[in-house]
Regions:
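Generic N-terminal helix/loop capping motif
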Residues: 75-82, 86, 306, 310, ...
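N-terminal alpha-helical interaction blocks
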Residues: 24-122
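A short linear-motif detector with a strong N-terminal bias
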Residues: 65-69, 104-108, 153-157, 186-189, ...
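Exposed alpha-helical structural elements
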Residues: 47-51, 67-75, 243, 302, ...
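Bacterial N-terminal signal peptides
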Residues: 2-16
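Boundary at the C-terminal end of the N-terminal hydrophobic targeting segment
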Residues: 17-22
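Substrate-recognition/cap regions that form aromatic- and gly/pro-loop-enriched pockets
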Residues: 308-377
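Sequence context surrounding c-type heme c attachment/ligation sites in exported
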Residues: 117-308, 351-427
Length: 428
């Protein structure tokens, strides 16, 4: 598994074309985002990195430089990104790929709308934000001490980060490759977008993984022909690791972990961001051309299926991370009066206890063009209240629908008034 931005590739699995077709009925063509309707390159970002730069320029925030880690730790703190989110990728899939090896993996940190990549000794930090209107926006930050650090927007990244694999919009992708002992990827072994629908056993090729997962297998921690041959004889000989000390020296890294649960959240999140960017772009273009979104209804249904995890690959064993990421993430809320939250994990049969994406609270969702946002909220209400009994959402039990509905009623701002009504069919 690996991440591209600035040449980042988030690598994992084997279901590429099928995923894209399921999402957009095969419409993986590039969106003309350089044209006036979107005007990606000409439009300044208003995302988290752009806002942080403004605060730095006004003197409201001062980043601290460390001789060993550069701006890394101070930047994580300024953006409220926990070091517990660290995941480690050793496949050579980055702008600075020559510096990445199994001995010097790239550390990837993230929160709901920012990704940061750090490589020991590398000249720049690789940074990506999710702008609510533009989607993925990519930056570098020179690892040189200065009184006024500057994030430099780099559209060169779109050579990899705007393709059918990112749903035709500026975005991110997670994939899984076998690598040799130097981290060079084998493109034949599975070049596919990975998210919560990908079977567990196909994930994390090219990544280190810490955490327990019973008899279930994955591709993590393996590099070189000998390791993969051993994995055929003893499938979990590098699985269920709670420490990476025998595999790599992580002195100087923010954490000694590459948390399994953090990886699972990362792969869900990256594809969600691409999905919502595509919806945003398509809605803008449809309204410009037709003044309606009737042609986008099937795309909306695909998004709702992803939002509600209806095609999630079931877990075959209980999984547990090692960095404390799960507890940190779950604590972020928001919570209803009963203490329930969409960030609560299950980790036995599925990722989340209440399968509705926490990113429904995101700025990107709230800033969808009004016709699309209203349509999605209406359809979501129909599903959660049991008015929609279609087989596409049959994986959601009446009890689960009711719980999600109650959580959203108490925690999601600016819901339409009809969401407050008590009519719930078959969910008592």
């Amino acid at each position: 598994m690996a991440i591209w931005w600035m040449g980042w590739l988030v690598v994992m699995g084997t279901v590429a074309g099928a995923v894209a077709q399921a999402d957009f009925q095969g419409a993986t063509h590039m969106v003309p985002f350089e044209e006036d309707t979107i005007s990606y390159n000409k439009t300044p970002s208003t995302g988290p990195i752009a806002r942080l730069q403004s605060r730095i320029d006004r003197g409201e925030v001062k980043l601290k430089y460390d001789p060993k880690s550069g701006w890394r730790d101070s930047l994580l703190e300024a953006l409220a990104i926990s070091p517990k989110s660290q995941t480690l990728v050793f496949s050579k899939t980055s702008l600075q790929r020559e510096r990445i090896t199994p001995a010097t993996p790239r550390a990837v940190f993230f929160n709901d709308d920012v990704y940061i990549g750090w490589i020991p000794g590398a000249p720049v930090l690789e940074i990506s934000e999710v702008d609510a209107k533009l989607g993925g926006v990519f930056y570098t930050l020179e690892q040189t001490e200065t009184a006024q650090p500057k994030f430099v927007r780099n559209n060169q990244c779109l050579e990899c980060h705007a393709s059918a694999k990112t749903m035709g919009v500026p975005g991110h992708l997670i994939r899984s490759f076998k690598t040799d002992d130097q981290g060079i990827i084998d493109l034949i072994t599975g070049v596919s977008e990975v998210n919560h629908r990908t079977p567990f056993e196909d994930r994390w090729g090219g990544w280190y993984v810490t955490g327990t997962h019973g008899k279930a297998t994955h591709r993590g921690n393996l590099h070189g022909k000998a390791a993969f041959q051993m994995a055929e004889e003893k499938p979990n000989f590098l699985g269920n690791l709670t420490s990476l000390k025998k595999l790599v020296d992580l002195e100087g890294y923010a954490s000694p972990h590459s948390d399994l649960v953090a990886l699972m959240v990362l792969e869900h999140e990256a594809h969600f961001h691409n999905f919502i960017t595509r919806l945003h772009y398509e809605t803008q273009m449809a309204m410009s051309r037709y003044q309606h979104i009737r042609y986008l209804r099937s795309m909306g249904e695909g998004f709702l299926k992803y939002l509600l995890f209806t095609e999630e690959a079931p877990l075959k064993a209980r999984v547990k991370g090692t960095a404390g990421f799960a507890d940190h993430f779950a604590s972020l809320g928001p919570k209803d009066r009963r203490g329930r939250s969409l960030r609560q994990f299950d980790l036995e049969a599925r990722l989340f206890k209440y399968p509705c994406s926490f990113l429904i609270y995101s700025e990107a969702f709230d800033m969808l063009p009004r016709p699309m946002r209203e349509h999605l909220l209406q359809r979501l209400h129909e599903i959660l209240t049991g008015q929609d009994t279609s087989p596409e959402f049959a994986t959601l039990s009446p009890e689960t629908r009711r719980a999600i509905l109650e959580i959203l009623r108490e925690t999601k701002l600016n819901l339409p008034d009809y969401w407050r009504a008590e009519s719930v069919s078959g969910a008592r």
